[in-house]
């Protein structure tokens, strides 16, 4: 074979091998970096732009797509120990003509974390209101979506600032009082009684604990590679002391039943979405809300756990779009493609 041809194949093979080897090395040595790159790439692909806004010396980090228009803007509040990017799987299936805003909740990701901050549910509600005011998002009433802890905050926000919100989607929200405790809550109470707050199931510190948390929060049993589990843990470990402080605050007497105590004040059209197999917050919470919120509708998803947004993103997006169409434009029966 001609020497030039051999050289060409060697160069081509080397060119292909370098990025492949770099990827493999990154996967094995720095899985957390790959996870960050993954979110960056997904945001870019979906057209979500990251911005910062300040209220005095407090910084909020958020991502957005689109501009305010004749349709209500949509503000999305994530759950405990998550971040704004958890909504990307749903954003993928939402129409491009909606103005979407996903904010990092107080102390999370790019939003200020202060030891002086009030992390109670009401404290978080007031912070989110500051964010809304900074963006002037309430120049026209907007649609508010929250899941888990974010659902608790969203519901209380709608009760505290009714003129800001035109409609509401609560996805397996926390903050309700049940007649009986499920197994997860019983376990939390046992930990509380034994003062073993270092072993909160939602705050993993090893790949094994991360795997257990994923199984707790999901009905679908994902087969997650060990390196990805390690990467997920590596991303969280620097923040675990904050997560522990936040968790103890939101399950304290001050915040534990915040949504329950305010649900009768919610007057806007409300959509309640819940996974039937939720092991963290029992699906019976949907009926509790529906009985108290007059203008509400319930959507229970079969074969779905607590992580509704991650397990059923397409269905969640469809339910939200159809709900918005029915509430704000009854003549429009637009369906998702």
UniProtKB/Swiss-Prot annotation:
Which GO biological process entries does UniProt record here? acylglycerol catabolic process; long-term synaptic depression; lysobisphosphatidic acid metabolic process; monoacylglycerol catabolic process; negative regulation of cell migration; negative regulation of cold-induced thermogenesis; phospholipid catabolic process; positive regulation of lipid biosynthetic process
Which keywords has UniProt assigned to this entry? Endosome, Hydrolase, Lipid metabolism, Lysosome, Membrane, Mitochondrion, Signal-anchor, Transmembrane, Transmembrane helix
> Which GO molecular function entries does the Swiss-Prot or TrEMBL record give?
monoacylglycerol lipase activity; phospholipase activity
Membrane topology term reads: Single-pass type II membrane protein
- Which residues are annotated as active site? 148, 278, 306
Which cellular component terms (GO) are annotated to the entry?
A: AMPA glutamate receptor complex; GABA-ergic synapse; glutamatergic synapse; late endosome membrane; lysosomal membrane; membrane; mitochondrial membrane; mitochondrion
Q: Under what name is this protein listed?
A: Monoacylglycerol lipase ABHD6
Q: What class of enzyme is it?
A: hydrolase
Q: Which organism is it from?
A: Rattus norvegicus (Rat)
Similarity comment text for this entry: Belongs to the AB hydrolase superfamily.
List residues in topological domain: Cytoplasmic.
30-337
Catalysed reactions, as listed in the record:
Hydrolyzes glycerol monoesters of long-chain fatty acids; 1-octanoylglycerol + H2O = octanoate + glycerol + H(+); 1-decanoylglycerol + H2O = decanoate + glycerol + H(+); 1-dodecanoylglycerol + H2O = dodecanoate + glycerol + H(+)
Provide Extracellular-side residue ranges. Answer: 1-8
Q: What EC number(s) does this enzyme carry? A: 3.1.1.23
Family annotation (InterPro entries): AB_hydrolase_1, AB_hydrolase_fold, AB_hydrolase_sf, Epox_hydrolase-like
Subcellular location(s) of the protein: Late endosome membrane; Lysosome membrane; Mitochondrion membrane
Q: What does this protein do?
A: Lipase that preferentially hydrolysis medium-chain saturated monoacylglycerols including 2-arachidonoylglycerol. Through 2-arachidonoylglycerol degradation may regulate endocannabinoid signaling pathways. Also has a lysophosphatidyl lipase activity with a preference for lysophosphatidylglycerol among other lysophospholipids. Also able to degrade bis(monoacylglycero)phosphate (BMP) and constitutes the major enzyme for BMP catabolism.
Q: Which Gene3D superfamilies match?
A: alpha/beta hydrolase (3.40.50.1820)
Transmembrane feature ranges: 9-29
């Amino acid at each position: 074979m001609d020497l030039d041809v051999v050289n060409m194949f060697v160069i081509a093979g080397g060119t292909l091998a370098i990025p492949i080897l770099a990827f493999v090395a990154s996967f094995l040595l720095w899985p957390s970096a790959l996870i960050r790159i993954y979110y960056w790439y997904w945001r870019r692909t979906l057209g979500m732009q990251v911005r910062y806004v300040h209220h005095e010396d407090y910084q909020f980090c958020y991502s957005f797509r689109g501009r305010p228009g004749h349709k209500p803007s949509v503000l999305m509040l994530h759950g405990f120990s998550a971040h704004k990017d958890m909504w990307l799987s749903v954003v993928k299936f939402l129409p491009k003509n909606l103005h979407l805003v996903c904010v990092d909740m107080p102390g999370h990701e790019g939003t200020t974390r202060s030891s002086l901050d009030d992390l109670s549910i009401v404290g978080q509600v007031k912070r989110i209101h500051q964010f809304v005011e900074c963006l002037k998002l309430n120049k026209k009433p907007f649609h508010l979506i929250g899941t888990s802890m974010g659902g608790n905050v969203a519901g209380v926000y709608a009760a505290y600032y009714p003129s800001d919100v035109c409609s509401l989607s609560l996805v397996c929200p926390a903050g309700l009082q049940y007649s009986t405790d499920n197994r997860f809550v019983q376990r939390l109470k046992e930990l509380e009684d034994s003062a073993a707050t270092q072993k909160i199931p939602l705050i993993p510190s090893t790949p094994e604990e991360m795997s257990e948390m994923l199984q707790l929060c999901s009905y679908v049993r994902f087969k997650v590679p060990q390196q990805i589990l390690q990467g997920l843990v590596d991303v969280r470990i620097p923040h675990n002391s904050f997560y522990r402080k936040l968790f103890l605050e939101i399950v304290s007497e001050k915040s534990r039943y915040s949504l329950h105590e305010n649900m009768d004040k919610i007057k806007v059209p409300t959509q309640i979405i819940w996974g039937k197999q939720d092991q963290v917050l029992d699906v019976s919470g949907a009926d509790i809300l529906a009985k108290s919120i007059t203008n509400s509708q319930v959507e229970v998803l079969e074969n779905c756990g607590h992580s509704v947004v991650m397990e059923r993103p397409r269905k969640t997006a469809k339910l939200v779009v159809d709900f918005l169409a029915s509430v704000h434009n009854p003549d429009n029966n637009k369906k998702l493609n």
